[in-house]
Amino acid sequence: MKNYLSFGMFALLFALTFGTVNSVQAIAGPEWLLDRPSVNNSQLVVSVAGTVEGTNQDISLKFFEIDLTSRPAHGGKTEQGLSPKSKLFATDSGAMPHKLEKADLLKAIQEQLIANVHSNDDYFEVIDFASDATITDRNGKVYFADKDGSVTLPIQPVQEFLLKGHVRVRPYKEKPVQNQAKSVDVEYTVQFTPLNPDDDFRPALKDTKLLKTLAIGDTITSQELLAQAQSILNKNHPGYTIYERDSSIVTHDNDIFRTILPMDQEFTYHVKNREQAYRINKKSGLNEEINNTDLISEKYYVLKKGEKPYDPFDRSHLKLFTIKYVDVNTNELLKSEQLLTASERNLDFRDLYDPRDKAKLLYNNLDAFGIMDYTLTGKVEDNHDDTNRIITVYMGKRPEGENASYHLAYDKDRYTEEEREVYSYLRYTGTPIPDNPNDK
């Protein structure tokens, strides 16, 4: 008799009906496969939600994928954080199934659950799978758990499996400390990100350094950390200064439940109480005490010295353009629009049928607006006043049978850059219109 994938209660059936991938909610509906790119390796898509024990509250999780063909290296973890127990088993036929351990799946879901937590009060602990958690393939075949709670999935042919449903969670509570740590090595690493768009900034490789060794309850302030960050910035990026702190997070002895420090106010971090750390002495085989560790990871926004923060609502650097498209024979206004741009180099013609031109502001045809069969005549008027630059583009009907982009100046496949440059009338202020604008 087959076992339901209970992972503890033998009540957990993994049934799989693929659905639309939602970044925060479970997958639903078979049409989701049509929108996903094809995969090269068999994958398990994990799209579950958390249900808080004893309540009706649901916790959303972003879906993630597990590559079923990755192999653990040298007894370590795979890319997905699965232990060496979750491994491939070769068979004589070449069909290589992948064994997924229950504990590994729960751990991967736990890590995803806390990945986007922004407050220490938002931590939840994954207890187990709920009874509606199911795994199937794209054909609806159900995969059941073995007696040990593991599930074995074939990886040939290449396909995607889905784990959906719920996991049971509860608010995270720290366990009482039985053997308090004696000292903690406080390590520090920092990452800098330019506040303004900045092509010159080259982030240095993150380096971890030992700040100090403290006892449980000792403190370190936000000002001390800021000074440390500024010192590293001065060394690696002397032309920049810190603008503001983005985040400060403390990882305790590799515990996934970290301490999130305030980002918008001054703070004092008190070294957290925890169990004494040990390691096995290779010679004696006995446990020996070692210093515990706190890794403080910070992120800061930085500015070039003398530069002001970019204001997305500041339009003082933008220029106003009024663009008019006029029928050269009747002077009828075909289309008009006003644009704000920071770069006059964008004031050039683009082909609506060519995505390479998407940054350019002027059209060489108006087909996309339902104004059909027009093209450039070569006649363009460029007028200025104190606040506005008015561009009038005169257009005429293109010859029957010609495509919308036949105009010599912008035919990218038939003419050289030099030939097309002649017809870039507006790219540089003062460039004259060609003498024979009808010869295009």
Swiss-Prot record:
UniProtKB keywords: Plasminogen activation, Signal, Virulence
Cellular component terms (Gene Ontology): extracellular region
Secretion signal, residue range per the UniProt entry: 1-26
Alphabetical list of InterPro entries matching this protein: SAK, SAK/SK_sf, SK
Highest taxon of source: Bacteria
Cross-referenced SUPFAM superfamilies: Staphylokinase/streptokinase
Pfam families: Staphylokinase
Function: This protein is not a protease, but it activates plasminogen by complexing with it. As a potential virulence factor, it is thought to prevent the formation of effective fibrin barriers around the site of infection, thereby contributing to the invasiveness of the cells.
Protein name, as recorded: Streptokinase G
Organism the protein comes from: Streptococcus sp. (strain 19909)
UniProt lineage: Bacteria, Bacillati, Bacillota, Bacilli, Lactobacillales
